[in-house]
């Protein structure tokens, strides 16, 4: 976060103590002080906010281009089959027959996953609640817990899943076009990246389905943190699986 701020991106930087350390302990637990950021997240973004979010993600990718620390994506495509191994019964409990469908998806993704795309530091969780606006203007991104190295276009695909689906589960092509227009105003996607977006978006939906399925359990009385329902991303998987031709109407080329 400090690197991004030093390179012009609006990120909250950790505050150093008198000795220059940014990580300390409070009550025996690791702790850090982080700068305050202005702005607010939105639940129903406007088209201008979608364009701003897309531009903000490209800004992040460009600002992080020289970052020389690296972190493997432990929730990336190479790990999905292993993540699903202990979850077959949980998938079928969620929806009868779902395990076989997910196995078929995993095989398809493994067979068609791209290689050689531009790689760099990615946010990997660029959801609306991690992005701040003032009015329609993008002003900051937060929550870099999952930040890692991966295809830059995979980060775009994560965002398309997060920002461009309607509450009824349908994919909003107009929203996707706005997001991608904003992104490409700062960092144009290559032809290979555009061609890979459908499979990357399918894979991004798989990543969040699997992590949510891992965490899914009944909410205990008084529990403050409620797990996210994996069915949201099961429905997104179905869109990518059955309606990939709709996504492939290529809003990236608009």
Predicted region positions:
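All-alpha amphipathic helical-bundle segments outside canonical DNA-binding/catalytic cores
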Residues: 189-201
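Charged catalytic carboxylate motif
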Residues: 52, 56, 101, 155, ...
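ATP/Mg2+ or Mg2+-diphosphate-binding catalytic cores
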Residues: 86-88, 208-254
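ATP-binding pocket architecture of kinase catalytic cores
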Residues: 1-69
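Generic structural signal for conserved hydrophobic packing positions in ordered secondary structure
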Residues: 14, 32-34, 60, 122, ...
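A cross-family kinase active-site recognition segment
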Residues: 43-97, 117-119, 224-227
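Active-site activation/catalytic loop segments of kinase-like enzymes and analogous catalytic loops
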Residues: 153-188, 202-219
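Active-site acidic catalytic loop and adjacent metal/ATP-binding pocket
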Residues: 14-15, 107-154
């Amino acid at each position: 976060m400090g690197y991004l701020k030093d390179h012009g991106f609006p990120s909250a930087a950790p505050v150093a103590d008198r000795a220059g350390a940014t990580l300390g302990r409070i009550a025996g637990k690791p702790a850090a002080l982080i700068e305050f950021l202005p702005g607010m997240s939105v639940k129903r973004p406007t088209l201008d906010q979608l364009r701003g979010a897309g531009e903000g993600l490209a800004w992040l990718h460009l600002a992080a281009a020289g970052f020389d620390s690296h972190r493997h994506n432990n929730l990336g495509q190479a790990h999905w089959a292993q993540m699903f191994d202990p979850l077959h019964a949980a998938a079928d409990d969620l929806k009868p027959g779902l395990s076989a469908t997910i196995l078929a998806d995993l095989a398809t993704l493994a067979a068609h996953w791209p290689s050689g795309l531009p790689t760099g530091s990615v946010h990997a969780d660029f959801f609306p609640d991690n992005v701040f606006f003032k009015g329609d203007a993008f002003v900051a991104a937060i929550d870099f817990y999952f930040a890692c190295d991966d295809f830059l276009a995979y980060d775009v695909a994560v965002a398309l899943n997060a920002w461009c689906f309607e509450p009824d589960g349908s994919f909003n092509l107009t929203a996707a076009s706005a997001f991608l227009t904003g992104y490409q105003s700062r960092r144009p996607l290559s032809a290979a990246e555009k061609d890979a977006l459908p499979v990357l978006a399918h894979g991004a939906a798989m990543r969040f389905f699997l992590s949510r399925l891992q965490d899914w359990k009944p909410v205990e009385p008084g529990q403050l943190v409620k797990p996210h329902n994996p069915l949201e991303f099961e429905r997104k998987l179905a869109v990518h699986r059955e309606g990939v031709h709709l996504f492939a109407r290529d809003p990236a080329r608009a």
